[in-house]
Amino acid sequence: ATLSSHNFISETVWLAHKESLLAYYIAEADIFLATKGDEIIGFIALINLEVPALFVAPKYQNLGIGSRLLLYVKFICIHLWLRVYKKNKNAIHFYQNHGFLIIDSCIDPLTGEEQFVMDWKNRPLMN
């Protein structure tokens, strides 16, 4: 899912850092899985209030699985933030539909690509 949703980044970049990223997520993140039988079809990672990763297997995308994973962490957290590549228009739209706002931008040192910093707070419906 990483390669298909980030096709603007060279596959060699992901492959070069795959092991270190996996080790980091396993050591630092709470990881919540979406499964179908024994198959993992998606996951969301949570490190404190950051969502560093949300992926759904390509054949299971657009079925609400990513939304359910995100809604779960929104249920257990009052505030979340994440970074998303500026070129990943589908992800930006997805997060905006879930109440995230773009609050800043930065350059990812791993890829050299611009990212938006997005923020979500459990805001009351009425003031």
Regions found by a protein language model. Name each.
Residues 1-22:
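Conserved GNAT-fold acetyl-CoA-binding loop/helix
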Residues 75-87:
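Conserved GNAT acetyl-CoA-binding A-motif
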Residues 62-75, 93-97:
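Conserved acetyl-CoA-binding loop-helix of GNAT-fold acetyltransferases
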Residues 47-61, 84-85:
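A short, internal acetyl-CoA/4′-phosphopantetheine-binding micro-motif in the GNAT/acyltransferase core
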